[in-house]
Amino acid sequence: MADNQEERPHFPLDEGSIIEGVSDQVIVVVLLSFVAVGSLIYLLLRNDEQNIHPENQDRVRAVREQLQNEQETPAPPRPQFYSDMTCPVCLQQATFPVETNCGHLFCGSCIIAYWRYGTWLGAINCPICRQTVTLLFPLFGATDQEDAQNILQEATGYNRRFSGQPRSLMDRIMDLPTLLRHAFREMFSVGGLFWMFRIRIVLCLLGALLYLVSPLDIIPEALFGILGFLDDLFVLFLLLIYISIMYREVVTQRLYR
């Protein structure tokens, strides 16, 4: 009777897998996903050390001395906008802080004085990382204080002159963390981005999600295994760059309203 029984198909498990019953390729894909997401979160929330680049130390020192000489009376206690946030130019707590497109923060008056020091012909390089500064993001709201209004006007004038400069692919990648952080912050804030831009971001994210879950891939995972997952990450990366480009265009258009 046993001889008449049909032989049941036997599917052997991966004997050399790290976790029994789970393919090593699945484990690698999951780990890479966590690494990619963790790296993106780190880039969006990072707070780099505010160390002046050696090539800019002389210029920063001159600007610091100039600001100290112009200050006739002792400065009042400055409000602390961030934990342990010190402007690397004046070495004090940042007041009316301004963030560059490379993600470094300065006092609004300090970065404007740094720009004015010397020639005004072109965009400045960040005193910390030497990246070209094409956008200044004021991190304070409009107030009745004259100093705040002057800084907002100076930052707006700077952005009008340099925000539309051509950007290389490497520059766009380096600007990605800061632009995405500001874009998503405004997306979920009242009175932030206009609705058409929010809809475009949502549609882009939905398109990326559909591509990730779709069985139709440029490099199918069924044939190429772990290599087939790389095209999904590449599409997601291109999507983030596209969102940052759209947000830069929105910021530039605001300057001419």
From Swiss-Prot:
Gene3D superfamilies: Zinc/RING finger domain, C3HC4 (zinc finger). GO terms for cellular component: endoplasmic reticulum membrane. Pfam families: DUF1232, zf-RING_UBOX. InterPro entries: DUF1232, RNF170, Znf-RING_euk, Znf_RING, Znf_RING/FYVE/PHD, Znf_RING_CS. Its EC number is 2.3.2.27. It is an enzyme of class 2 (transferase). Residues 1-24, 222 are lumenal. Residues 46-200, 244-257 are cytoplasmic. Keywords: Endoplasmic reticulum, Membrane, Metal-binding, Transferase, Transmembrane, Transmembrane helix, Ubl conjugation pathway, Zinc, Zinc-finger. It catalyses: S-ubiquitinyl-[E2 ubiquitin-conjugating enzyme]-L-cysteine + [acceptor protein]-L-lysine = [E2 ubiquitin-conjugating enzyme]-L-cysteine + N(6)-ubiquitinyl-[acceptor protein]-L-lysine. One of its GO terms (molecular function) is zinc ion binding. It is a multi-pass membrane protein. The chain crosses the membrane at residues 25-45, 201-221, 223-243. A zinc finger (RING-type) spans 87-130. It comes from the Eukaryota. It is found in: Endoplasmic reticulum membrane. SMART domains: RING. One of its GO terms (biological process) is protein ubiquitination. Its main location: endoplasmic reticulum. Pathway: Protein modification; protein ubiquitination. E3 ubiquitin-protein ligase that plays an essential role in stimulus-induced inositol 1,4,5-trisphosphate receptor (ITPR) ubiquitination and degradation via the endoplasmic reticulum-associated degradation (ERAD) pathway. Also involved in ITPR turnover in resting cells. PANTHER family: E3 UBIQUITIN-PROTEIN LIGASE RNF170, RING-TYPE DOMAIN-CONTAINING PROTEIN. This is E3 ubiquitin-protein ligase RNF170. It comes from Xenopus laevis. The gene is rnf170.
